[in-house]
């Protein structure tokens, strides 16, 4: 029982409109990544500027509680935004709320840089307030961008298109390092200062207060540039037809987009909707889709514990790898420069390639294999780093950097990408955005465990604690490896076939062997 508008979307050739959709949705993730990760390049500068205590003979450092809130509050906002906008995306439509997320991101990125106050505490409170709402807007982009790209794409290249949107996160991380490096390089040239061990007071340039504000505010630029084009996108044909029940409008919108003639099938649509009218909170939904929802939520939760722990604590790992000097050997702005340069190098050679390997291979290898191998390799490399941490830190920094980079590579050519793709494919249209939001919010809950738990535990940088943290993260990834068996391969099939909306056998009733990629492909055509 297929609708012509859905079949047209599934069989459409790849054309310029698909590329445009990738860029528009992807630029949101570029902004998301920049805003979430640029804080890592300036958090030590905030400590030097606002929390220097001359009696310690050490550079100022954010207190553990303040550091956790500054770096983690955006994650709390992101989780909230995912749930709210994911639900709204199903209730009101993807397009109606898509522009709101961008407005919030632009406004709060600018306001983060304008954080004010007469004391260190008041500045941090203001900064955290705006970064919470920045995260709220960022969170809304997760389910909406994934769902929109999933519903626009054809079934042959859908995974690659969704992964390409998410891969812009890698570009955003690189850009966060690059912008911080360029701006701090300019400031370092114009506002020279002695190192901390030469003059603790003069080593912190007052101009650094302008530097961190500029770095945070730059995040508003790419989001603002795409607002017009985001508002020009029509509602997805699947939402218009299946949820709103307007076959005529769906056919007209998609005919204009795909440049083909599509017949509106209103009578057939009524039959289609009647067969798929069970609510989200029902036993029928959980019988059909509960295992997949548990799988996507648990895998994303476990992945983000490790992924965000690494990203948010890498500024503390870099000195151990020899990528930057010890803090006493630098002035405040030089520390920003060296931290951002190290972040840029690791992202360019470790983080960025993994995203695009997923884009190029996801339709060949499938989501299941990529996620399985990614979790396993992350667990292996983190285990090696944990066991040999002192040796790597003291005697083989090059190997340390290689292993650390490989964990990022296999995170992104692995579960960091596939946990974003799978929830956009596994669930019915009328709850797709909400289910993606549940999965993404579960991931952000894991990120908060990393930000508030692992980061707090390793904040003092003692080798024993970092070693233990790496071992914990290795075990976490191993659990993610086994949780992957709760999801199924979606490669090469329509969204309606995967979710059972077309009346065929739901994947949730398939045997465990059917879940493995490349096995019993003939089961796709079996009837209930």
UniProtKB/Swiss-Prot annotation:
Q: Which CDD domains match?
A: MFS_PhT
**Reactions catalysed, as given in the entry:** phosphate(in) + H(+)(in) = phosphate(out) + H(+)(out)
Positions on the Cytoplasmic side per record topology: 1-18, 90-96, 144-158, 230-292, 363-371, 423-433, 490-528
**Gene Ontology biological-process annotations:** arbuscular mycorrhizal association; cellular response to nitrogen levels; cellular response to phosphate starvation; detection of phosphate ion; lateral root formation; phosphate ion transport; response to symbiotic fungus; transmembrane transport
PROSITE patterns listed in its UniProt record: MFS
Compositionally biased residues, Basic and acidic residues? 497-507
Give the matching InterPro entries.
Answer: MFS_dom, MFS_sugar_transport-like, MFS_trans_sf, Phos_permease
Extracellular domain ranges by topology: 40-68, 118-122, 180-208, 314-341, 393-401, 455-468
Where do the record's region annotations for Disordered lie?
Answer: 497-528
Phenotype upon knockout?
Answer: Impaired phosphate (Pi) starvation induction of lateral roots formation. Plants missing PT4 or both PT4 and PT8 fail to establish arbuscular mycorrhizal (AM) symbiosis with AM fungi in high nitrogen conditions, leading to premature arbuscule degeneration (PAD); these phenotypes are suppressed in nitrogen-deprived conditions in an AMT2-3-dependent manner.
What top-level branch of life does the organism fall under? Eukaryota
Which keywords belong to this entry?
Cell membrane, Membrane, Phosphate transport, Symport, Transmembrane, Transmembrane helix, Transport
Where is the major localization of this protein? membrane
Q: Where are the transmembrane segments?
A: 19-39, 69-89, 97-117, 123-143, 159-179, 209-229, 293-313, 342-362, 372-392, 402-422, 434-454, 469-489
Entry's pH dependence statement: Optimum pH is 3-4.
> GO MF annotations for this entry?
phosphate transmembrane transporter activity; symporter activity
Q: Which GO terms describe its cellular component?
A: periarbuscular membrane; plasma membrane
Q: How does it sit in the membrane?
A: Multi-pass membrane protein
**Distribution of this protein across tissues and organs:** Mostly expressed in mycorrhizal roots. Also observed in root tips of non-mycorrhizal roots, in a phosphate (Pi) depended-manner, highest expression levels being observed in low Pi conditions.
Under the heading Gene3D superfamilies, the entry gives: MFS general substrate transporter like domains
Compartments, record wording = Cell membrane
Which family does this protein fall into?
Belongs to the major facilitator superfamily. Phosphate:H(+) symporter (TC 2.A.1.9) family.
Further remark: Although related to the sugar transporter family, it does not transport sugars.
> What is the role of the protein in this entry?
Low-affinity transporter for external inorganic phosphate (Pi) probably involved in the acquisition of phosphate released by arbuscular mycorrhizal (AM) fungi (e.g. Gigaspora gigantea, Glomus versiforme and G.intraradices) during AM symbiosis; required for propper mycorrhizal arbuscule morphology. Acts as a Pi-sensing machinery at the root tip level, independently of AM fungi, involved in the regulation of early root branching and lateral roots formation.
The name this protein carries in UniProt is Low affinity inorganic phosphate transporter 4
- Name the source organism: Medicago truncatula (Barrel medic)
């Amino acid at each position: 029982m297929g609708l012509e508008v859905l079949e047209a979307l599934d069989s459409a050739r790849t054309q310029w409109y698909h590329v445009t959709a990738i860029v528009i949705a992807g630029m949101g993730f570029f902004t998301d990544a920049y805003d979430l990760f640029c804080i890592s390049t300036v958090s030590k500068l905030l400590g030097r500027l606002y929390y220097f205590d001359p009696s310690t003979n050490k550079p100022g450092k954010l207190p553990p509680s303040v550091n956790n809130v500054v770096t983690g509050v955006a994650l709390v906002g992101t989780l909230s935004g995912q749930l709210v906008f994911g639900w709204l995306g199903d209730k009101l439509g993807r397009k109606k709320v898509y522009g709101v997320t961008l407005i919030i991101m632009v406004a709060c990125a600018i306001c983060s840089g304008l954080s004010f106050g007469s004391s260190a505490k008041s500045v941090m409170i203001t900064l955290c307030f705006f970064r919470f709402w920045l995260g709220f807007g960022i969170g809304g982009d997760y389910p909406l961008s994934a769902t929109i790209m999933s519903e626009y794409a054809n079934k042959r290249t859908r995974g690659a298109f969704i992964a390409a949107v998410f891969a812009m996160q890698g570009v955003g991380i690189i850009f966060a390092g690059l912008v911080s490096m360029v701006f701090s390089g300019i400031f370092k040239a114009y506002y020279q200062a002695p190192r901390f061990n030469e003059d603790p007071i003069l080593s912190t340039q007052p101009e650094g207060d302008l530097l961190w504000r500029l770095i945070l505010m730059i995040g508003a630029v790419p989001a603002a540039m795409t607002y017009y084009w985001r508002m020009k996108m029509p509602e997805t044909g699947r939402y218009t037809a299946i949820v709103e029940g307007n076959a005529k409008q769906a056919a007209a919108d998609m005919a204009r987009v795909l440049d083909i003639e599509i017949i509106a099938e209103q009578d057939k649509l009524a039959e289609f909707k009647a067969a798929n009218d069970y609510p989200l909170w029902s036993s029928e939904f959980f019988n059909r889709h509960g295992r997949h929802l548990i799988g996507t939520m648990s895998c994303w939760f476990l992945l983000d514990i490790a992924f965000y722990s690494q990203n948010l604590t890498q500024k503390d790992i870099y000195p151990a790898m020899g990528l930057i000097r010890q803090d006493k050997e630098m002035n405040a702005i030089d520390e920003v420069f060296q931290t951002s340069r190290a972040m840029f190098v690791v992202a360019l050679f470790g983080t960025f390639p993994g995203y695009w390997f997923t884009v190029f291979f996801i339709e060949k290898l499938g989501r299941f294999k990529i996620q399985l191998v990614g979790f396993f390799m992350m667990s292996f490399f983190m285990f090696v780093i944990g066991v040999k941490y002192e040796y790597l830190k003291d005697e083989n920094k090059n190997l340390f950097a290689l292993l650390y980079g490989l964990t990022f590579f296999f995170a992104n050519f692995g579960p960091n990408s596939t946990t974003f793709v799978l929830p956009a494919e596994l669930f019915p249209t009328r709850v797709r955005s909400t289910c993606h939001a549940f999965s993404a919010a579960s991931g952000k809950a894991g990120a908060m465990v990393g930000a508030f738990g692992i980061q707090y535990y390793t904040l003092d940088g003692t080798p024993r604690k970092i070693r233990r943290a790496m071992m914990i993260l290795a075990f976490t990834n191993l659990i993610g490896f086994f949780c992957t068996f709760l999801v199924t391969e979606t490669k090469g099939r329509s969204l309606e076939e995967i979710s059972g909306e077309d009346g065929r056998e739901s994947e949730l009733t398939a045997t465990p062997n059917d879940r493995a990629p490349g096995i019993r492909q003939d089961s796709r055509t079996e009837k209930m």
